[in-house]
Amino acid sequence: MAPGAVMVSGLVKRRYNGYVAVAGPLTNLTLFIIGIPVWVLILGITGAFDFSHTPLFETGLSLSVYLDGNSILWQSMLIDAGIVWLYANLILGLFNMIPWGPLDGAKVKDWSESAFYTVFLIFLIPVISMFFGFWSPYNLLEGLVNLIF
């Protein structure tokens, strides 16, 4: 029978706990940044934006139609997958940096307030500017695909 959680190396120092806590949001940031060229490559190679049945909803979400008669519009699904990838990583990173309870933001703020505010603003600025319409994942991906392909 397993003994459960066993402390082997003593208490974790606040600094190391902060490093571990900030790793989650930074992973979301990394996935967001890596996702941009990956999705531009995928959408550019497949020509998904050349397909005319994907109307743009002004907030950046595509108001997608996945079925057209008897055919499945995989291009719309592919575009939405890229959009959701970018949205999800930004929103999850911001949510995780909320300095409350078990979320990583509380641990990061306990370790270093300057690190907390830096990472929090890295997520907050793009999310707020996205909701006010200054940019959208759809426009970002479409613009880069049109520029490169």
Give the positions of each predicted feature:
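Hydrophobic transmembrane alpha-helices and their immediate loop junctions
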Residues: M1-F149
